[in-house]
């Protein structure tokens, strides 16, 4: 495998698509056009290629944020009118929405947002012999809303987000206290003032996300590009008579990852029966910026969905044999999710390779900002991803 040539191809593809289509919010014309361009290339080498259109409700995934602020303001009003039950209900409602919409990525608010068409694209490269397993190589081509908190005072990100949620929890608890002790005027006044001051923190969440999108180079067009180059590589080997014997390759570029993993969900739902018929492994990629920060996820979706720990450990061992330093890591609570979660829910053995710090306190300084450009993606991290995944696929094909 000519790593330098493949890496060059990966970068040129990403550069071309960003230059042609720009930022790509799911469901926009730019997003669909980028998907079509990826599909056109996949169709040149895949044995079978396909587009999967589905609907996304634009803006719904982050809709819980402003609802949280609105419910908090309503709670304050109820408190000042000495109606703690109303404040309690407002706080509990906002926490329910937060839990279902963000912690679990359920489509609670979708019906209230504009319905747009989105598009997954993928291709299949068959092995030379009987299919005994299939491997999904995946990234996503949509880009994220700009997160203003990562631009303005990013060191306060954790305080602003986690602190805001904690303040809403305080609204619930203190409202409950007032229901238990309704006849203590000083207690009532103190709680009213404390919760009102909390609006200074919670109110900032209204401005959490910008209407504009990032260029989306590292998050996550480069991953889709790596998947395509690996697909072309395996097709080329087969054409030379050196192809995979029993392993089918599926090259996948999901849409709407940034809208709550909706593209991966649509794909996993449609092909769930195929996953049962043929043992399926998912090699997902996301946020590949820095080779010094490489790790494989063992859980996803705010740590609510378990990924395949054995697969992650096997990939770490492969990387070690290639002198590439990696590790395994759980998805931290409140840090979101990747497309691997939706595949795991349908029984796919899957992990995600990530190349940046992934905690509430530390992320790449270009993540979800206008600076998510190709020059921020390390050449080495792309070569490492290519090396690890092709080596692993060759290894399992020999089993």
What does each model-identified segment do?
Residues 1-30, 45, 208-213, 362-372, ...:
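N-terminal capping segment at the start of a domain
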Residues 3, 7, 32, 36, ...:
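A composition-biased, non-transmembrane "mature-region" signal
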Residues 9-12, 16, 33, 37, ...:
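Extracytoplasmic/secreted proteins, especially bacterial periplasmic and envelope-associated proteins
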Residues 23, 53-55, 291-399:
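Active-site-adjacent substrate-binding region
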Residues 23-126, 148-180, 185-192:
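A non-catalytic alpha/beta surface segment that caps or lines the substrate-entry region
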Residues 91-94, 98-122, 130, 143-148, ...:
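Acidic/histidine-rich catalytic neighborhood of metal-dependent amide-processing enzymes
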Residues 127-135:
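Proline/glycine-enriched tight loop/beta-turn segments at coil->beta junctions
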Residues 135-137, 252, 281-283, 349-353:
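Hydrophobic/aromatic beta-strand patches that form the interior of the parallel beta-sheet core
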């Amino acid at each position: 495998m000519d790593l330098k040539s493949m890496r060059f191809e990966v970068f040129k593809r990403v550069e071309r698509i960003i230059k042609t289509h720009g930022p790509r919010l799911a469901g926009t014309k730019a997003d669909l056009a980028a998907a079509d361009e990826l599909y056109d290339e996949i169709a040149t080498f895949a044995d079978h290629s396909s587009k999967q259109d589905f609907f996304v409700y634009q803006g719904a995934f982050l809709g819980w944020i402003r609802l949280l602020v609105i419910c908090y303001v309503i709670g304050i009003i109820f408190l000042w009118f000495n109606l703690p039950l109303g404040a309690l209900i407002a706080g509990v409602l906002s926490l329910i929405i937060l839990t279902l919409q963000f912690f679990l990525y359920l489509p609670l608010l979708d019906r209230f947002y504009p319905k747009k068409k989105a598009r997954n694209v993928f291709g299949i490269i068959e092995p030379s012999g009987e299919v005994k397993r299939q491997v999904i190589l995946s990234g996503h081509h949509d880009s994220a809303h700009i997160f203003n908190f990562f631009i303005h005072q990013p060191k306060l990100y954790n305080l602003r987000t986690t602190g805001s949620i904690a303040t809403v929890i305080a609204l619930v608890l203190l409202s409950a206290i007032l229901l238990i002790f309704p006849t203590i005027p000083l207690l009532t006044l103190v709680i009213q003032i404390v919760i009102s001051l909390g609006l200074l923190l919670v109110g900032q969440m209204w401005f959490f996300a910008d209407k504009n999108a990032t260029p989306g180079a590292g998050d996550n067009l480069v991953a889709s590009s790596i998947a395509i180059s690996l697909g072309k590589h395996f097709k080329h080997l087969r054409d030379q008579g050196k192809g995979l014997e029993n392993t089918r390759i599926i090259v996948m570029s999901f849409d709407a990852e940034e809208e709550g993993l909706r593209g991966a969900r649509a794909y996993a739902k449609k092909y769930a029966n195929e996953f049962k018929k043929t043992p399926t492994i998912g090699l997902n990629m996301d946020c590949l910026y820095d080779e010094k920060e490489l790790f494989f996820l063992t859980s996803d979706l705010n740590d609510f969905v378990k990924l395949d720990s054995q697969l992650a450990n096997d990939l770490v061992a492969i990387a070690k044999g290639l002198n590439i330093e990696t590790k395994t890591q759980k998805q931290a609570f409140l840090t979101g999710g990747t497309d691997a979660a939706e595949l795991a829910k349908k029984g796919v053995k899957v992990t995600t390779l990530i190349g940046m710090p992934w905690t509430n306190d530390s992320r790449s300084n270009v993540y979800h900002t206008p600076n998510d450009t190709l020059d921020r993606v390390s050449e080495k991290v792309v070569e490492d991803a290519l090396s690890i995944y092709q080596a692993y696929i060759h290894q399992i094909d020999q089993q």
